[in-house]
């Protein structure tokens, strides 16, 4: 089984997309870090959400914050919740109201003006993320969006948006998790002085 070309092209494509992040998205990544840190300094909670692979990324980033990002960095837990993690709430909402309301209903219940909603969507067109953004804004929350391609319907709807310059879902998700890790580093450094 020979897959040298496939493997090489996947790695090169991933490198190419990530190389574009630094010059074009550095200010937005820094701005997102500031929004998250400011919320946490004000006793806010970070609410993450996504669908499919982005759901896994949302849960991953929230877990890094609640537990710890870097091994050996002992620190207080950071309040971060992945809204896509409670199966009872998700299935009840999908059954009773519809899948598009999964995150909106939870933000309606819990979101406060000191909190931040962080939505991950590779297309920028996920209806449940769109409704969550609208609910977050109603609650006076800040919104950070990790998007892909042209940003979709969510382009221009956030306080800070980070749009990955690719239309390939895998490349967008790889970049989203990289940015999530960078944001974890910024938070640990700003709140606890950890490198």
From Swiss-Prot:
Binding, substrate: 51-53, 64, 95-96, 121-123, 126, 173
Binding-site residues for Zn(2+), renumbered to this chain: 60, 64, 173, 181
Subcellular location as annotated: Cytoplasm
Cofactor detail note: Binds 1 zinc ion per subunit.
A molecular-function term among this protein's GO annotations: D-sedoheptulose 7-phosphate isomerase activity
Record carries keyword Zinc: yes
The entry's keywords: Carbohydrate metabolism, Cytoplasm, Isomerase, Metal-binding, Zinc
Every SIS domain range: 36-195
Gene3D superfamilies with a match to the protein in the record: Glucose-6-phosphate isomerase like protein, domain 1
GO BP terms: carbohydrate metabolic process; D-glycero-D-manno-heptose 7-phosphate biosynthetic process
Entries under PROSITE patterns matching the protein: SIS (PS51464)
Isomerase is among the record's keywords: yes
InterPro entries in the cross-refs: GmhA/DiaA, Phosphoheptose_Isoase, SIS_dom, SIS_dom_sf, SIS_GmhA/DiaA_subfam
Cofactor(s) demanded: Zn(2+)
PANTHER family: DNAA INITIATOR-ASSOCIATING PROTEIN DIAA, SEDOHEPTULOSE 7-PHOSPHATE ISOMERASE / DNAA INITIATOR-ASSOCIATING FACTOR FOR REPLICATION INITIATION
Homology family: Belongs to the SIS family. GmhA subfamily.
Name assigned to this protein: Phosphoheptose isomerase
């Amino acid at each position: 089984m020979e897959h040298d070309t496939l493997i090489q092209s996947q790695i090169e494509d991933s490198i190419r997309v990530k190389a574009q992040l630094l010059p074009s998205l550095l200010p937005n990544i820094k701005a997102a870090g500031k929004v998250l840190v400011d919320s946490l300094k004000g006793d806010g909670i970070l609410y993450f959400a996504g669908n499919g692979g982005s759901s896994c990324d949302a849960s991953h980033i929230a877990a890094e914050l609640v537990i710890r990002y870097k091994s050996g960095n002992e620190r207080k837990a950071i309040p971060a919740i992945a809204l896509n993690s409670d199966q009872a709430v998700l299935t009840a909402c999908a059954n009773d109201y519809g899948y598009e309301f999964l995150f909106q209903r939870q933000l309606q219940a819990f979101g406060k003006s000191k909190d931040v909603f962080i939505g991950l969507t590779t297309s920028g067109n996920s209806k449940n993320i769109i409704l969550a953004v609208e609910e977050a804004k109603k609650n006076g929350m800040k919104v950070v969006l990790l998007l892909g391609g042209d940003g979709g319907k969510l382009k221009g709807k956030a306080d800070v948006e980070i749009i990955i310059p690719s239309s390939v879902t895998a490349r967008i998700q790889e970049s989203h998790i990289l940015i999530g890790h960078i944001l974890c580093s910024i938070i640990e450094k700003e709140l606890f002085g950890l490198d």
